[in-house]
């Protein structure tokens, strides 16, 4: 039809098109992230989270604890006293890097990060944290504290079990943009997916 012809012409002209949530690459990425959140053996269960602190980029590995597909929200846990929390509060434009060395798929994801403040929701996540893992949130010294002679004796001291929840922090990372790169074939495939106001815009890129 004429409409289909015009559609194809527009698509091939600028390789830039608004898509619904049924695009194959988009659906593939959603499946990878969902699997990463609930499958410990997934290559997407851990990722590199980068934030800006004092004009320097700081990167660290974190564990993907949940992925809420409806609002494209990546969740990880941390200690609220950690430097990354301070960085997010000052500048919440962040980036998440995933890579599957077997499937050779890289996801560079630009995010906007927030500290979850809803105590009811925080408690739901806390209840799922294994008892042996909760202890990591109960050190008397904050993460990244320098160990010297003064506080060496406190290095392995912990707060009471009743207080460790106070240091537990849930970080929400809302996806703004995904750079998808597949290196599995001779003709590498790369796409940029922009998510804005619940609309999905896809651009084909040179790998």
Regions found by a protein language model. Name each.
Residues 20, 106-207:
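Charged, gly/pro-rich active-site loop segments
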Residues 15-16:
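Targeting/processing segments of secretory and organellar proteins
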Residues 51-54, 98-102, 182, 195-197:
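Short acidic, glycine-rich loop/turn motifs
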Residues 65-104:
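A short mixed-secondary-structure module that forms the rim of ligand-binding clefts
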Residues 19-71, 75, 86-87:
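An N-terminal domain-cap segment
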Residues 44-46, 72, 93-94, 167-170, ...:
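Short, surface-exposed beta-edge/turn micro-motifs
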């Amino acid at each position: 039809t004429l409409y289909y012809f015009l559609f194809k012409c527009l698509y091939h002209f600028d390789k830039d098109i608004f898509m619904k949530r049924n695009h194959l690459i988009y659906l593939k990425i959603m499946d990878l992230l969902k699997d990463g959140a609930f499958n410990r053996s997934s290559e997407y269960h851990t990722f590199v989270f980068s934030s800006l602190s004092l004009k320097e980029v700081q990167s660290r590995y974190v564990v993907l604890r949940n992925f809420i597909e409806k609002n494209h929200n990546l969740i990880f846990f941390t200690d609220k006293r950690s430097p990354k929390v301070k960085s997010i509060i000052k500048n919440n434009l962040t980036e998440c890097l995933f890579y599957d060395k077997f499937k050779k798929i890289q996801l560079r994801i630009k995010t906007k990060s927030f500290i979850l403040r809803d105590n009811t929701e925080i408690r739901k996540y806390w209840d799922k944290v294994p008892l042996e893992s909760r202890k990591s949130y109960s050190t008397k010294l904050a993460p990244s504290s320098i160990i010297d002679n003064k506080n060496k004796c406190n290095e392995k001291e912990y707060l009471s079990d009743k207080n460790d929840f106070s240091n537990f922090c849930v970080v929400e990372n809302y996806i703004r943009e995904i750079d998808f790169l597949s290196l599995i074939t001779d003709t590498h495939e790369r796409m940029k997916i922009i998510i804005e106001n619940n609309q999905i815009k896809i651009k084909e890129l040179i790998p």
